[in-house]
Amino acid sequence: MEEVPFENAMQRLEEIVDLMNQPTTSLDASLALYEEADALMRICESRIRQVEQRVRELAEKRHESSLFEEQAVVR
């Protein structure tokens, strides 16, 4: 599955849940939907991990910067 924007993947996951909850959805269709949902969840989880890592990096830089500023004030 090609790279899908996070928001689009989440929207499609909601659609899949709705489709799977319909009593008219066949077993084979449910399986296909489940497989699609699995791929979309992997995309979302990967993107969340990327964002979390970037936030950690930014927080660490901010912390290092404030330590540097504190040391400069002490001198």
Curated annotation (Swiss-Prot):
- SUPFAM superfamilies with a match to the protein in the record: XseB-like
Top enzyme class, one word, equals: hydrolase
Give the keywords, sorted.
Cytoplasm, Exonuclease, Hydrolase, Nuclease
Q: Which InterPro entries match?
A: Exonuc_VII_S, Exonuc_VII_ssu_sf
Q: Which Gene3D superfamilies does the entry link to?
A: Exonuclease VII, small subunit
Kindly report the protein's main subcellular placement as a broad class: cytoplasm
Superkingdom of the organism of origin: Bacteria
The Enzyme Commission number assigned here is 3.1.11.6
* Coiled-coil stretches noted in the UniProt entry, renumbered to this chain: none
Q: Name a Pfam family for this protein.
A: Exonuc_VII_S
Q: Which GO terms describe its biological process?
A: DNA catabolic process
User: Among the entry's GO cellular component annotations, what is one?
Assistant: exodeoxyribonuclease VII complex
HAMAP family xrefs: Exonuc_7_S
Q: What does this protein do?
A: Bidirectionally degrades single-stranded DNA into large acid-insoluble oligonucleotides, which are then degraded further into small acid-soluble oligonucleotides.
Descriptive protein name = Exodeoxyribonuclease 7 small subunit
